[in-house]
Structure formats: C-alpha cells, structure tokens
Amino acid sequence: MKALVLFSGGIDSTTALGLAIKKYGKDQVIALSISYGQKHDKEIRAAIAVAEYYGVEHLFLDLSKIFQYSNCSLLQQSMEEIPEESYAEQISKTNGDKPVSTYVPFRNGLFLSSAASIALSKECGVIYYGAHADDSAGFAYPDCSPVFNQAMNEAIWEGSGHQLKIEAPFVNVSKAEVVRIGLELGVPYELTWSCYEGGEKPCGKCGTCIDRAAAFQANHVEDPALR
C-alpha cells in the first residue's frame, strides 16, 4: 500500500513522514506540501530539503485563495501580529472559548479533503498527518482533536468507497513524545522549520517556537536546528 503524508516541513509532519517511510518504504510514500497564504515560505523550503533528504516523491498544492477572507495572524493579508507568547497564555485570555489567533479556519479539514482526492488519484490507501494532543488542548486548534480526526476519518472512508483512511499517529500524545519518536527514527530535525515568523533564524517567542523548545528540553536534547 502507498501512503500520502501531509507535509509542512515542521517537526510533527516530518516525524509522520519518517514513520510512514519506516512502515512502507520511501518508494511507497508521497509527501504533499500545501501553501495556504502564509506570511513566509520557510516551511515550504524546509519541506523541500527534508523530502530530498528522504528521496520521496514531493507534490505541491496552493489553497491560498480559499483562506483570503480570513484574518488569521499567520496569513499575508492579516493585520494581526503573531502573538509572542505560549499557547497556554493565549488560551488563558479567552478561557478556551475560541481558538488561538494562529488557527487557520478549518485548515486541516480542507487539507485532508484535498489530500484525499490526490491520494485516491495516486492510488494511496492512507493519509498521514501530524496533529498531536498539545495542538488541540484548550481548544487552541480544534481541527487537531481526536474527535475531529475520527469524524474526518469516517467521512473520507465513506466518501472514498472504503478505499482510503487517515493515520494520525500523534493525536493522543504530546509534542515531546513526537520528538522522542523522531529521535529514535533519526529524523533530520536540523532541516525542519517551525517558527511562525520568516526570519533568518527562529524567533524563539511565538507559540510554536516555545512548544518546540519545550519538546526538545523534555527529551534532554539540544534542538539541532539551533546549532
């Protein structure tokens, strides 16, 4: 069976890619990177580097027009600044009543639906994506939750005529556990990019930089991307 991996070039999707390659072999794995109108292309460039490292087929899709009406702080047209604080701090300000400002409206739903069409066309039987438990905690990113994953899996399974399913290996584990798994796999974290800003180096202040640093610290390992 062939696998398609939703692949951003960050820690989570790169670890998911590593797992898929371990299970199916690189010749049976396709990486799909999706542009959604984000403020920089650092993630895409990282994705290209990692895909080349593994030697997998790499596809690209542009969904930026779908998100042109959103004011999510990650997007080019947004007037909002990307928050320089942890997700926990952001959630505390809203009591968890709404997602964080870096939540792109229903992004994972659109990504998975688009990936399903491509996966079926490429004769894949499974879609991997790297949502983890920390993302859905406190309603920060509701399209990363186990409930969302189950609903999308059922929709894609039925809509594909029982030919395609979702594999979300980290949906019930923390980012620290994702990094632990990746370290065991020998994932090239030095090639990945997580920061929401597009600077020469990671800002170290945005929510995803803070989460990334904590995940490596929990594993008592220096982040290789910062060496």
What do the PLM-derived regions correspond to, one by one?
Residues 198-199, 220-227:
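Short cysteine/histidine-rich metal-coordination sites, predominantly Zn2+-binding motifs
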Residues 109, 113, 193-214:
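Local cysteine-cluster metal-coordination motifs and their immediate loop/turn environment
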Residues 135, 216-217:
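Glycine-rich nucleotide phosphate-binding loop and flanking beta-alpha elements
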Residues 25, 188, 211-214:
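Short functional micro-motifs and their immediate structural scaffolds
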Residues 160, 217-220:
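Short amphipathic alpha-helical interaction/hinge segments
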Residues 162, 189-191, 202:
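A short pocket-lining beta-strand/turn micro-motif at the edge of beta-sheets
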Residues 182-184, 189-198:
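Short, intrinsically disordered, charge-biased short linear motifs at domain edges
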Residues 1-186:
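ATP-dependent adenylation/nucleotidyltransferase module used to activate substrates
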